[in-house]
Regions:
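Glycine/proline-rich active-site loop of Rossmann-fold NAD(P)-dependent oxidoreductases
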Residues: 128, 175, 187, 198-207, ...
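Conserved Rossmann-fold NAD(P)-dependent oxidoreductase catalytic core, especially the SDR/UDP-sugar
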Residues: 77, 99-169, 190
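Mid/C-terminal beta-alpha module of Rossmann-like enzyme folds, strongest
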Residues: 245-307, 341, 345-346
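A conserved pocket-lining segment of Rossmann-fold NAD(P)-dependent short-chain dehydrogenase/reductase
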Residues: 161-164, 210-230, 234, 238, ...
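Conserved C-terminal active-site "lid" loop/helix of NAD(P)H-dependent oxidoreductases
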Residues: 232, 267, 293-334
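N-terminal Rossmann NAD(P)H-binding glycine-rich loop of SDR-like oxidoreductase domains
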Residues: 3-23
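Amphipathic terminal alpha-helices
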Residues: 323-331, 335, 339-357
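NAD(P)H-binding glycine-rich loop region in Rossmannoid oxidoreductase-like domains
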Residues: 50-96, 100, 121-129
Length: 357
C-alpha cells in the first residue's frame, strides 16, 4: 500500500510515519523544505516537499508522482498549525492548505481511495458546561476498573452529532477545513477529532513538565474542569484501524475513554519525575486572560509565536472536554492501551532519555 503523510515532521505526523513503516507500507513523508527530519531517519522513507500554499505546484508534483509510481492509496493529512501570531494564519494553513491539497490531488488524477483528516475536538467550542450532578460514570470498553463506578460527573460528554460552535481561530479553521472536505466531489474521507494529544516529541504539554521541575503546578479557574487526553500512539492506532477497515464518510471522536480533573496531569508528572515540594497555584481566569493578551501582543513585535495567546486562553478556560468515543469503540474496535498514568510515565522516560529534563 502506498501512503502519503502530510505534516510528517511534526509530533503526530512522525508517529504516523513510524506506524506505517511498521506495517510495511510504502511511505511518503510530506514535509516543508525547512522542516526538521530528526524523527524521520528511517531509510525506507520517501520524502516529498509540499508547499500547501501553492495549488498549481502541488498539482504538478502529484502528476509527476503518479507517473512514477501511481496514485497513493491513502493520504493522511496531519499538516497544520495549532498556534500563530496572526488569526488569518490559521485559515491560510489549516483551511486553505487543505483545499489546495485536495484540489491538487483531483487535478492530477491522483485521488486516493481514502483521505484521512486529523481535525480536533476544538471545533465544538465550549459545549455542555451546565452541571448535571452525580452520575454513573460510563465505561465504553465494558471492563472493570475505575470507570463504571458512581462519582461526581459535572458535565455531559460532547457527542459527534453536536453542532460545532468553535470559539477559537484554530477551531474555526479546522471546522472550515472539515466542511470543505465533506462536500468535495469524489473524496473518500474519514475525519478524526481527537482531544488533547500528548506524548514524546510534543512541546506544549512539555511546558507543564518544565513547570513541575521548577516546583510549581498551575491550574486555571475555580469552576471544576473535566479534561480528557489521548496518548499519541493510541490516536495513531485508531487512524490505522480505519485504514485497515477501509472506512469512509465517517467521523470519530478520540480520547483514552477516561475523564480527569485539572490536577491529575500535573500530579502524574510530579510522580513520574520524582519531584518533591510542588506548590499548586490556581490562577483566576481574568489574570490568565491578561497574561495571554500581553503575550499575544508582544509576539507581534518580537516576531516569535507565543505559547500563550487569546486562543489558548479560550481553550484553557473551557471546562468540559469529555467526549463520546463509542463510535470508534464499536466500528474500529478502538481499545486505547494508555491511560494517563501509563502515557505520562512513558513520556517522562522519553524526556529523560532525550535530556529534555
Amino acid at each position: 500500500m502506498n501512503i502519503l503523510v502530510t505534516g510528517a515532521s511534526g509530533f503526530i505526523g512522525s508517529f504516523l510515519v513510524e506506524k506505517a513503516l511498521d506495517l510495511e507500507m510504502n511511505v511518503w513523508a510530506g514535509v516543508r523544505g525547512s522542516s526538521s527530519r530528526r524523527y524521520l531517519q528511517d531509510e525506507r522513507i520517501n520524502f516529498i516537499e509540499l508547499d500547501l500554499d501553492d495549488e498549481a505546484a502541488l498539482t504538478r508534483l502529484f502528476a509527476k508522482a503518479k507517473e512514477e509510481f501511481g496514485a497513493w492509496d491513502v493520504v493522511i493529512h496531519a499538516a497544520g498549525i495549532t498556534k500563530s501570531r496572526f488569526r488569518h494564519d490559521f485559515f491560510a494553513v489549516n483551511c486553505n492548505g487543505t483545499r489546495n491539497l485536495v484540489n491538487a490531488l483531483r487535478n492530477a488524477g491522483a485521488m486516493p481511495r481514502q483521505f484521512v483528516y486529523l481535525s480536533s475536538l476544538s471545533i465544538y467550542g465550549a459545549l455542555r458546561e451546565e452541571p448535571i450532578g452525580m452520575h454513573k460514570d460510563s465505561n465504553p470498553f465494558g471492563s472493570k476498573g475505575e470507570s463504571g463506578e458512581f462519582r461526581e460527573v459535572i458535565y455531559e460528554p460532547i457527542r459527534k452529532d453536536d453542532t460545532p460552535q468553535p470559539n477559537t481561530a484554530y477551531g474555526m479553521s479546522k471546522a472550515a477545513a472539515e466542511n470543505f472536505i465533506r462536500v468535495s466531489d469524489g473524496l473518500q474521507w474519514v475525519i478524526f477529532r481527537p482531544t488533547g494529544v500528548y506524548g514524546p516529541r510534543e512541546r506544549d504539554y512539555f511546558l507543564m513538565a518544565k513547570s513541575i521541575k521548577s516546583h510549581v503546578d498551575f491550574a486555571v479557574g475555580f469552576k471544576r474542569q473535566e479534561i480528557t487526553f489521548v496518548y499519541v500512539k493510541d490516536l495513531v492506532d485508531a487512524v490505522f484501524a480505519a485504514i485497515e477497515r477501509g472506512v469512509t464518510k465517517k467521523t470519530y471522536l478520540i480520547s483514552d475513554g477516561r475523564t480527569y480533573n485539572s490536577r491529575t496531569f500535573g500530579q502524574l508528572l510530579q510522580n513520574a519525575m520524582g519531584i518533591k515540594g510542588v506548590v499548586r497555584l490556581t490562577v483566576p481566569l481574568w489574570i490568565l486572560r491578561a497574561v495571554c493578551a500581553v503575550a499575544q501582543t508582544a509576539g507581534k513585535f518580537t516576531g516569535k509565536t507565543p505559547t500563550l495567546n487569546l486562543d489558548k486562553y479560550r481553550i484553557m478556560k473551557q471546562r468540559n472536554w469529555q467526549c463520546d468515543i463509542s463510535d470508534a469503540v464499536k466500528e474500529l474496535d478502538y481499545r486505547p492501551k494508555y491511560d494517563l498514568k501509563k502515557g505520562v510515565d512513558e513520556t517522562v522516560a522519553w524526556y529523560k532519555k532525550e535530556q529534555w529534563i
